[in-house]
Amino acid sequence: MNTPLTRKPLVLGLLLATGLGTGNAVAQLEEVIVTAQKRTESLQDIPIAIAAYNAENIESMGLFNAQDVGMASPSVQMPLYPTAGNNLALFIRGIGNADSVVITKDPTVGVYYDGVYAARSTGLLADLSDLERIEILRGPQGTLYGRNTTAGAINFINVKPTGELGFKQVLGAGNYGSWRSISHLNLDDIGGFKAKFTASFSERDGWVDNRGPNTIPGLDYTDYYLRETQGFRVALRYDGLENLVVDYSYDYSDMTSSPGYHQYGGPVGGLNPAFQPITDSFRDRLEETRSPIGGQPTAYYLPETDTEVDGHNLTVDWAISDSLTLKSITGYREFDDDASQNFTESFGNAGSLEVWTVTEHEQFTQELQLLGNQDRFQWVAGLYYFEEEGTQTEQQYLDRATVDLTGIIALDLTTFPPTPCSDGSTSDPFCSDFTMFFPLYLGEYAVDVDNESWAAFGQATWNATERLDLTAGLRYTDDEREAVRTHDGLLWNSFGPGVSASDLDETDYTLIADYRWTDDISTYAKVSTGFRSGGSSRNGLDFNQAFDKETVISYELGWKTELLDQRLRLNGAIYYMEVDDIILDYLPDPVNNPQFVEVFNSGEAEINGVELDVTWAMTENLLVGFNYAYLDYDIKDAIFPDGSDRSDTTGLVWAPEHAWAASVDWSIPMGFGEWLLHADYSWQDDQLALANTNFGEVLVEDFGLLNARASISGIEMLGGDWQLALWMKNVTDEEDVSYAIGATSFTFLMPRTYGAELIFEF
């Protein structure tokens, strides 16, 4: 939009904010600056449903990692991946990828670090340590962002060097042995060269103790939910030549963790595969590992999960003239992930499933942008190239066999009972004659992927009148993929070898009409498309059977308003999406064979919803926020691999019908500083964690979380500015289920956590 607005030139998060300054006679919302359309613009001026958080928001809300951001955004779900402690699944508007760790299946939410696309979400749980802003774009972004953004995109924009000597230190400690340290150092400008260095460290003990009398010396029994991270970032900038800015950055993260603890919550009675009675069902959150056979404390073998991620980014920005800019973004990222999970005995009759997954991945991206601003036209044209290579190896074990495992191995305990123990019985699964069979090695398989993609795109906005803007965009993509699966050659290994390859092209477009009724009220109508690449079922029985691309078209009506003299911001959107050849996961037997996942295309999904974002500066010192998301869907022509039509029973996972978040920020000026009190509450409706199985749906019931933070800042002493803060998460200590697999395996919300932070800056 061309119409100028009088706003404060500061960046502030849309949904929740830290509070208002005390120097204004009249409260007024601060302007939100974003780069969602590849150029710097006010959030109120762009026809995109978007949430933005700046560095102050991240600090005042106590957002330690990306999952915290997801809880504050009702349209976004970020469940922790069940077998990898450093990986999140990403969903926006009901579209996502539950198997986010699998390298043969692409995401639906694009993740970008300073403009560089990250093909995999491994390492997304690294500490948020040096961010200027987070932008969450909702809805298909196929034109400007490309493939695999059918649900939306998340931009992580890091702070650039200032060229002025400065230092900031964050020190924190809390319960469960947690502590964190973040250090920032800016150096003086030397001949146009600027530099900034950041180091972050954090640690938290596991909150589920993995202990028991059955431990064996020399084996690892890591507590569940352990986290330890360290990261470094170097940012360099050169702007010594007129009209030229060169930014280079290197980031490194090393994360050690353990996954979530899956409790047995199924029925009691009956016998497990070792002919022991299942006597206990744990429907309440445990903080120590226990066996459903007798309920006694039991240790489960569990090594730590180790993840290393690093990346290089080179951005060159050349202002050719006042109206023309050439921009180059070059990125290289890689990660190594060694993940372990022991599902304990949470599957009941399947014994204790143990999974080890090792992933090595590297990618290269190059993007060229030409941006223009002539008279009544603003436009961008570009070329994009992407390639990735990766290897993923997985081993699976059972601590004992089960009568339902005959499809995996030729061993049936009802036909071939265990060898009698020395006393003639077969009741003791740990006697010497019986343990020769266990732990039962189900096999190892490896998948190698080699993917390449290139695209050409352009988008232009025409200021047709002083009030009306018309936008059109187009993107052409060519996508080539190849994946090869090999295995260890054992006869009972069901993950047989295979090759999957595809070569496709797709054209996406965007059409927008944006009308400003007044300087503070605008509405827009938008049509946009996107596609998600096809792939292969890493954990499927037939690896040669690939699945095709998934396409989406979205129709959206939105509004951006600032009322009451810019004290009330009321934004929203109504959308309808059609997803064709929808990619679905099919688990034939999640209770006994949870490792089998068939991925396939079937039918279409119709998704519609409403989103509302409200920010109100009630007084000069009191700010409230409210955000709401409604979602409904219908799936048609869902023909499953077994030939059955399951349109009436097929569901989308992590797609709650209702979700909302509310916040309050109250600033209290004092003679020696300023108090800031923050509280936020987020709630999500019932949602499916697992669907499309032969055993029915797996539901995670609704839950809400209350968080709070109190700080006093602006304390000047010892030559710097000091801040002291106290924080608490899950204030009411809710014990709801957070993830479920099958009808018996559940994880729970983290207990109440609390801590203190000391921040020093000069």
Feature map (PLM): residue ranges:
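Conserved C-terminal beta-signal and adjacent last beta-strands/turns
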Residues: 10-13, 359-371, 375-382, 652-762
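Acidic, small-polar-rich N-terminal luminal/periplasmic segments of exported/outer-membrane proteins
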Residues: 19, 28-164, 557
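Outer-membrane beta-barrel proteins
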Residues: 171-180, 203-241, 245, 258, ...
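Outer-membrane beta-barrel translocator/receptor signature
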Residues: 106-108, 120, 128-138, 143-219, ...
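Outer-membrane beta-barrel domain signature, strongest for Gram-negative TonB-dependent receptors
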Residues: 221, 227-380, 387-389, 569-570
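Gram-negative outer-membrane beta-barrel transporters
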Residues: 378, 466-470, 576-578, 600-691
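Structural signature of Gram-negative outer-membrane beta-barrels, strongest in the C-terminal barrel
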Residues: 237-241, 370-371, 382-386, 447-579, ...
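Membrane-embedded beta-barrel scaffold of Gram-negative outer-membrane proteins
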Residues: 313-319, 323-341, 516-532, 548-610, ...
